From Swiss-Prot:
Species in which this protein is naturally found: Human herpesvirus 6A (strain Uganda-1102) (HHV-6 variant A)
Name this protein carries in UniProt: Uncharacterized protein DR1
Stretches with biased composition (Low complexity): 347-359, 370-388, 570-581, 591-610, 666-676
Stretches with biased composition (Basic and acidic residues): 405-480
Record region (Disordered): 347-689
Comment field (misc): DR1 gene is not required for propagation in cell culture. Loss of a part of the DR region may occur in viruses propagated on cell cultures.
Compositionally biased residues, Pro residues: 515-539, 550-569, 611-620
Length: 689
C-alpha cells in the first residue's frame, strides 16, 4: 500500500520527495495513474528549484479549460486529452512520437500561482502581461508528463510548446528544471545561472546588484521598473583591494522622503534642487536617476545616467564626480575613488571659503567676476581643484573660480601656458597676468579713470567692441567644430577638466558621459556638455583690422620684425657648439589672435603654421610669426588650414629653395648637417630676400 503523507507529517515531505519521484518513475503508467487519483492535490517539492512544487492531479488540463484565454486559441489545444481519455498526444509537437504521455500534475510558478481570472478576455499573452512569471518571463503554468520509458516532458501551456526534461526520473532528481527550455528561453536571464533566480524571499545582497546591473544595460526605463520594486533594499559594495573595507547601498527614491522602509534616507529634496541644474547640463534633462545613497555617508548619492556611466554627487557641497563606466563594473570591482575617499572629509576644510556664508565669499565672487583669466586654476594640473557648486546667482563655479563665458579652448589655453605668459610679460609691457587679461585690465581702467580718456577714445572702444564680439564668436565656433571632430588637443596635454574638478588629473580623469568612438582616451567632451555658456551674437567682420584699445604700450613692446636665419652649421661642427636661436617674440593681440599650445609628442619644439582667427588682411608676402602647433595624437599630423576667400599663408617655394624638413619625435644622437634645424620649417625665398 502506498505511503500517504498526512498533514501532521509536513516536515517530512522534503525527505520523502525523492521517494515519490522514484515511485512515479519505477512503475507502469497504469499504476502511476492510480497513485495520482489516490493522492490528488498532493504537493511534491521539485529537485530544483526547491521553492516550486508539483501539484499531483490526474486531469490537470480539465482545470485549465475554464480560462477563455486558452479556449479561444485552438492551436493551444492541440494534443490535449479528450473528456473520455487520459493521454496527451505529442504528435502535433513531435511528429515522430510513437507513444502517448500521461499528465502527472501542474507546476504554477510561485510569483503567479493562479492570478489569471476566469473573466480574462485576452486573446494572446505577451511578455509584458502581469500574468506571466516575474522570474522567467514565460508562462506561469507548466504541465509535467511522463512517457512509457520513464522520460519526463514539460508542456508550456500558454506558449503551446512541448519540451523534454530528462530521459529518466533518476536523472531528473539531479537536474530538476535546470534544462527546461521553457525557462531558459527567456531573454532576460539567458546569461545568468538559474538557481539564483528562484528566491521567494528578499533578494540577497549579491544577487540584487547583479539584477540591477543587467537591467541598466537596457536604459533607464528598464532600470527604473526594477528599481521601484526594491526600494529600501540594501546591497553591499565591497572594496576591490581591501576586503574588509565595504559599505552598503540603500536603494531610495529621494522624492518620497522617509516613507516605505526608507527610514535611513536623508531629506535631500532641497539639496537636489541645487544639484538639478548641474546634472541637467552634464547628462541632459531626464537623463539621470539618483537610485541609492551610501549607508556610511548618507550625503553621497549614486546617479545612473542614460549612457551608462555612474556618477556620485555630494549633496552638501554640490560636487559631482564619475566613479564607474557602468553599474556592472561598479558591482564587480567596487570603486576605489568612492570607497577610499570615505575616510577623508568630503566637505572642504574650514577656512577655505567654500561655503557661501563664510567671510570672503562675496569678495572672492567679485574677484572672479572681474577677472576673465580666472579659469586657469580650474584647468591647471599643478594642484587639486575644488569641488563644483552652483552659486546663489545661478552660475556654475569650480570652487571659488567662476567659469567665464569664453569658449573652453581659450580657458584651457590659459591653463596650459600660465607660466609662459607670465614670463613673456616684460616683452609686451603687460601687467603680469598674460595677454588675455588685457580685456579685464581695460575694463578696470574704464571704471577708475574714465576722465583721462576722451570722447575719441570712447568711440574707438565702441567700434572695436563689435570687432571683438565677431572675433570671439568665430573663435568659439571654430573651437567647437574642432572639439566635436574628436581632436585630442586638450586630452593629451594633461589639463583635462574633471566633472566638478574633484581630485587631480591622474586620479580622476575626465571621461565623457557617452563614449562615441572606439578609443575613449582620444575624445574630449565638448564645452557645451560640461558647462555650456551663451556665445556672443554674430556680427559682420569688416575687411579692416580690428583695433583693440589697450593700455599705453610699454617701452619693451615693439612690432615684430623678420629676423635673419642663422647660418647652417657644417658637417664637422659638433651639435653642442651650435646655439639654438630663441623663439621670436609673440606679437601683441591687437595684430592677430594667437593660440599657444605646448607640444608633448616631441622633445624639441616644432614649428608649423596655425590658422589665425579672424584672418588678418596681411599680404602673403609679409612675414608671419611661427606658431607652436596644437597637441594631437601621435599618429596624426596637422595640416595648415586656409580661410576661404584668402590666399594661402605659405605660397609654394621655388624649385631652388630647399625643401622643408619633416618633424621628428626626438633629436638624433649623431651630429648631422640638419641636426640644428630639426623641427624648423624653411621659409620661402621671397621672405628671405
Amino acid at each position: 500500500m502506498p505511503l500517504t503523507v498526512r498533514a501532521g507529517h509536513a516536515p517530512y515531505r522534503l525527505p520523502l520527495s525523492n521517494y515519490w519521484w522514484l515511485l512515479l518513475g519505477r512503475h507502469s503508467l497504469r499504476h502511476v495513474h492510480s497513485y495520482l487519483r489516490l493522492h490528488k492535490g498532493l504537493r511534491i517539492p521539485l529537485p530544483w528549484p526547491e521553492q516550486e512544487c508539483l501539484h499531483l492531479h490526474p486531469k490537470p488540463y480539465k482545470c485549465l479549460l475554464r480560462y477563455p484565454c486558452i479556449t479561444r486559441q485552438p492551436h493551444l489545444l492541440q494534443g490535449w486529452p479528450t473528456k473520455s481519455s487520459l493521454w496527451f498526444d505529442p504528435k502535433p509537437y513531435h511528429p515522430s512520437a510513437d507513444s502517448k504521455l500521461l499528465p502527472l500534475g501542474l507546476i504554477t510558478l510561485s510569483a503567479c500561482s493562479t492570478r489569471v481570472s476566469a473573466t480574462t478576455r485576452w486573446s494572446s499573452f505577451h511578455a509584458t502581461d502581469p500574468s506571466l512569471s516575474w522570474l522567467t518571463g514565460s508562462s506561469p503554468w507548466l504541465v509535467i508528463l511522463q512517457g512509457q520509458g520513464g522520460s519526463l516532458f514539460c508542456h508550456d501551456v500558454l506558449q503551446g510548446r512541448l519540451y523534454i526534461l530528462s530521459h529518466s526520473v533518476s536523472l531528473f532528481l539531479k537536474t530538476g528544471l535546470r534544462h527546461c527550455e521553457a525557462i531558459y528561453r527567456a531573454p532576460l536571464w539567458r546569461d545568468r545561472p538559474l538557481p539564483s533566480l528562484w528566491t521567494c524571499r528578499d533578494p540577497d545582497k549579491a544577487f540584487l546588484p547583479t539584477l540591477l546591473a543587467r537591467s541598466a544595460r537596457r536604459g533607464l526605463a528598464a532600470f527604473y521598473a526594477l528599481w521601484r520594486l526594491h526600494l529600501g533594499s540594501r546591497s553591499e559594495l565591497s572594496h576591490p583591494v581591501l576586503e574588509w573595507e565595504s559599505t552598503e547601498l540603500v536603494l531610495t527614491d529621494w522624492r518620497r522622503g522617509r516613507n516605505e522602509a526608507q527610514r535611513d534616507a536623508p531629506s535631500v529634496a532641497e539639496h537636489f534642487a541645487r544639484c538639478r541644474p548641474l546634472l541637467d547640463e552634464l547628462c541632459g534633462e531626464g537623463g539621470w536617476l539618483p537610485f541609492a545613497f551610501l549607508s556610511t555617508s548618507p550625503h553621497v548619492w549614486l546617479i545612473l545616467t542614460e549612457g551608462g556611466p555612474v556618477l556620485a554627487v555630494d549633496v552638501n557641497d554640490t560636487s559631482v564626480w564619475r566613479i564607474a563606466d557602468d553599474l556592472e563594473l561598479l558591482r564587480r570591482l567596487g570603486s576605489l575613488l568612492l570607497l577610499s575617499g570615505l575616510r577623508l572629509p568630503l566637505r572642504p576644510p574650514s577656512g577655505s571659503g567654500e561655503a557661501a556664508g563664510e567671510p570672503g565669499y562675496e569678495e572672492e565672487e567679485r574677484r572672479g567676476r572681474a577677472s576673465t583669466a580666472s579659469a586657469t586654476a580650474a584647468t591647471s594640473t599643478r594642484g587639486p581643484t575644488r569641488p563644483t557648486r552652483v552659486t546663489r546667482k545661478g552660475r556654475v563655479a569650480t570652487g571659488g573660480v567662476h567659469l567665464s563665458a569664453r569658449p573652453e579652448s581659450e580657458e584651457q589655453t590659459d591653463g596650459h601656458h600660465g607660466r609662459q605668459e607670465s614670463s613673456d610679460d616684460h616683452q609686451r609691457g603687460g601687467s603680469g597676468r598674460g595677454h588675455r587679461d588685457d580685456g579685464a585690465h581695460r575694463h578696470a581702467n574704464d571704471k577708475t579713470e574714465p576722465q583721462q580718456r576722451g570722447e575719441h577714445e570712447e568711440r574707438k572702444q565702441t567700434d572695436s567692441g563689435r570687432h571683438e564680439h565677431a572675433q570671439e564668436s568665430q573663435v568659439a565656433r571654430r573651437d567647437e567644430e574642432e572639439t566635436e571632430q574628436g581632436d585630442s588637443e586638450r586630452s593629451c596635454g594633461g589639463a583635462t577638466q574633471t566633472y566638478g574638478g574633484r581630485g587631480r588629473h591622474d586620479s580622476c580623469p575626465s571621461i565623457p558621459l557617452s563614449v562615441p568612438g572606439p578609443d575613449p582616451r582620444l575624445w574630449v567632451p565638448p564645452p557645451h556638455l560640461l558647462f555650456p555658456s551663451p556665445l556672443p551674437p554674430m556680427t559682420p567682420v569688416d575687411d579692416e583690422p580690428s583695433v583693440r584699445p589697450r593700455c599705453p604700450p610699454g617701452p619693451a613692446e615693439e612690432p615684430p620684425t623678420c629676423r635673419p636665419r642663422p647660418p647652417r652649421p657644417s658637417s664637422d661642427t659638433p651639435l653642442s657648439a651650435v646655439s639654438r636661436p630663441s623663439a621670436p617674440p609673440v606679437p601683441p593681440p591687437s595684430t592677430a589672435r594667437v593660440r599657444f599650445f605646448l607640444s608633448s609628442s616631441s622633445s624639441s619644439p616644432s614649428y608649423s603654421p596655425a590658422p589665425l582667427s579672424p584672418p588678418s588682411p596681411v599680404s602673403p608676402s609679409s612675414p608671419r610669426s611661427p606658431f607652436i602647433p596644437p597637441i594631437r595624437s601621435p599618429g596624426l599630423r596637422a595640416k595648415p588650414r586656409v580661410s576661404s576667400g584668402h590666399p594661402a599663408a605659405f605660397p609654394p617655394a621655388p624649385s631652388s629653395a630647399p625643401a622643408r624638413s619633416e618633424r621628428v619625435t626626438s633629436v638624433p644622437s649623431s651630429a648631422s648637417p640638419s641636426a640644428s634645424c630639426v623641427g624648423k620649417s624653411q621659409p620661402p625665398a621671397a621672405h628671405t630676400a
